[in-house]
Each structure stands twice: as structure tokens, then as C-alpha cells.
């Protein structure tokens, strides 16, 4: 046994961490057309120009809450990979039950 724990099957060398790009302003990746498409799916005909930034901020808060809960479930199970079921349970915890992803 190489002392890698239960997940390590010799994948990679386990050396120094690579430099990661600093993540900021990723919320701008939710583009104006993407927000427009979501609104169209919801039945909206015309969209005010102020909606886009507001939508991004609301979406960011929502995702932060869901991801925080999902990571909590993942850590409790002593896993490092967030599964679809973690997200389903996180949404259920917030009162937004999601069907179709197991469980």
C-alpha cells in the first residue's frame, strides 16, 4: 500500500500543486443573452436593462447557498467529490425539491 488513502489508485505523482488562476468576476460569464433566454423560458416579453446585474447578484447568492449546503453534505460523508445527490439534498434542505436526479 502506498499510503494514499482509499481513493488513491496511483493517479498522478502527488507532487507540488500547480498554480491556479485567481477566480473573480466569473459571474460575468452569465451573459446578457443567457439571462434573456432564461427570461424567455419563463414567459417574459420585454426586459429592462437593469435586470441583468440584478439577476447575476441574485443567482450568485442562490448558488452560494446551494453549494455551501452541498459541500457540507459532502464533507460529512468524508468525500472530496460533490455528487448530484449532494446537490439534490441541498436543494431539498432549502425547500426546493428537485426530481429526476436519483434519490
UniProtKB/Swiss-Prot annotation:
The modification N6-methyllysine is found at residue 21. The modification N6-acetyl-N6-methyllysine is found at residues 6, 13. It comes from the Eukaryota. Residues 1-20 are annotated as: Disordered. One of its GO terms (molecular function) is protein heterodimerization activity. The modification N-acetylserine is found at residue 2. GO terms for cellular component: nucleosome; nucleus. Pfam families: CENP-T_C. InterPro entries: CENP-T/H4_C, Histone-fold, Histone_H4, Histone_H4_CS. Keywords: Acetylation, Chromosome, DNA-binding, Methylation, Nucleosome core, Nucleus. Residues 1-14 have a biased composition (Gly residues). Its main location: nucleus. The modification N6-acetyllysine is found at residue 17. It is found in: Nucleus; Chromosome. Residues 17-21 bind DNA. Belongs to the histone H4 family. PANTHER family: HISTONE H4 (PTHR10484). The nucleosome is a histone octamer containing two molecules each of H2A, H2B, H3 and H4 assembled in one H3-H4 heterotetramer and two H2A-H2B heterodimers. The octamer wraps approximately 147 bp of DNA. Core component of nucleosome. Nucleosomes wrap and compact DNA into chromatin, limiting DNA accessibility to the cellular machineries which require DNA as a template. Histones thereby play a central role in transcription regulation, DNA repair, DNA replication and chromosomal stability. DNA accessibility is regulated via a complex set of post-translational modifications of histones, also called histone code, and nucleosome remodeling. This is Histone H4. The lineage of its organism: Eukaryota, Metazoa, Ecdysozoa, Nematoda, Chromadorea.
